Design a protein with these regions (language model features):
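Domain-level recognition of nuclease-like catalytic cores that cleave nucleotide substrates
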Residues: 124-152
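Accessory nucleic acid-recognition modules appended to NTPase machines
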Residues: 1-86
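Active-site ExK catalytic segment of metal-dependent nucleases
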Residues: 77, 81-97, 104
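Short secondary-structure boundary/capping segments
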Residues: 6-7, 109, 126-128
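Short, charged, amphipathic alpha-helix that recurs within catalytic cores of restriction-modification
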Residues: 94, 99-118
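Hydrophobic, well-ordered secondary-structure elements that form the walls
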Residues: 46, 77, 89, 108, ...
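Conserved beta-strand segments of alpha/beta enzyme cores
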Residues: 52, 116, 133-135
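Short beta-strand/turn micro-motifs composed of small residues
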Residues: 121
Length: 152
């Protein structure tokens, strides 16, 4: 979903399994990347709470090291919609370096609307909001509190 253009675009599809165990069996237990599994679990949880879920894309223009202006497409893991509520959600297994923090927040900072922008991390942290209005919440709070999106 093109967030700025507010239309569906042709981008590579992402697939999520309703049962992570079936996902693992289908992949012959070869791919055990916790970050992919966490993203899949967030998707399942959003769907079980009644949200319509899309993958978002934000188009930005940046100047490369060579001085050329280049178009880049930044992904937003989930755009969760239910009624008049919309949330932009990034799944970030770890944000252990300043570079990783910038990477995870970049697509969210390019959005110019008032909907909540949330990063779900593996760590058990107290929900917090940064100076850009981006909320970071731990996966356990996200999964165990059905109303977390409204409360943060």
């Amino acid at each position: 979903f093109d967030v700025k253009g507010k239309k569906y675009i042709n981008t590579p599809a992402k697939y999520y399994f309703e049962d992570v165990g079936l996902r693992n069996a289908r992949l012959n237990f070869r791919q055990q990347e916790e970050n992919h599994i966490m993203e899949n679990i967030i998707y399942i949880e959003l769907r079980s709470r009644g949200y319509r879920v899309d993958v978002g894309v934000v188009e930005v223009y940046e100047t490369s090291n060579s001085g050329k202006r280049e178009k880049k497409l930044l992904e937003i893991d989930f755009i969760a919609n239910k009624g008049d509520k919309k949330y932009y959600i990034q799944s970030a297994f770890e944000m252990t370096s300043p570079e990783k923090i910038v990477q995870e927040k970049k697509s969210l900072t390019k959005l110019n609307d008032f909907f909540k922008k949330i990063i779900v991390v593996k760590d058990d942290i107290k929900p917090n909001t940064d100076e850009q209005g981006i909320i970071t919440v731990g996966i356990f709070d996200f999964l165990l509190n059905d109303n977390i999106l409204e409360q943060i």
